[in-house]
Each structure stands twice: as structure tokens, then as C-alpha cells.
Amino acid sequence: MFQKQQRIGLVIYLYYNRDARKVIKYGDLYYHSRRSRYLVIYINKEDMEEKLKDISRLTFVKEVKVSAFDDIDCDFVGNLHREPLEPQALPEQG
């Protein structure tokens, strides 16, 4: 039966955009920002540490960050629609 692969995103900052083609062989390219010179690629979670070391050693890579998408809590507790508050009566002063 088909098993879903655990994937993780890497944000790779480059010195030059022309080097983006050299990084694509490490994973699946998701996004390339030519203006800000970074890539987002997805790799298998089990291969993360090995590929992270390999990519960090490349001379044309400025910085590599691991995506924090897995750390975000997606369970929203409570009702997102809020009821309007009823006006409260002011205490009488006298």
C-alpha cells in the first residue's frame, strides 16, 4: 500500500541566481525568488541531515534554513466566530 513520505522544506539563500540549477538535484524545487535570491526545495525527512550538510558546504550557498512549517500548531481550539457582546447596564450613581 502507498505510504506517505515525510517531507521537509529547506530555504536556500544563494549569492547568484545562476547557481539555482546546481541545487535542484538535491530535492524538488518548490519556489525560486529571483529578486531575493533564495530557493525553497522539499526533501525526504530521513535524508535531511545528510543533504543539509552537503548543501551547506557548497561555495555558492550563502545560508540554509530548515522550514518551521512542521512546528506550527494547526489545531485551532474554540469557536473562531465571536458573538457580539451585549451592552452591560451601567451602575446607578446616586
Curated annotation (Swiss-Prot):
Keywords: Cytoplasm. Pfam families: DUF2129 (PF09902). GO terms for cellular component: cytoplasm. It comes from the Bacteria. The keyword Cytoplasm applies. The keyword Repressor does not apply. It is found in: Cytoplasm. InterPro entries: DUF2129. Its main location: cytoplasm. Belongs to the UPF0298 family. HAMAP family: UPF0298 (MF_01126). This is UPF0298 protein SZO_03600.
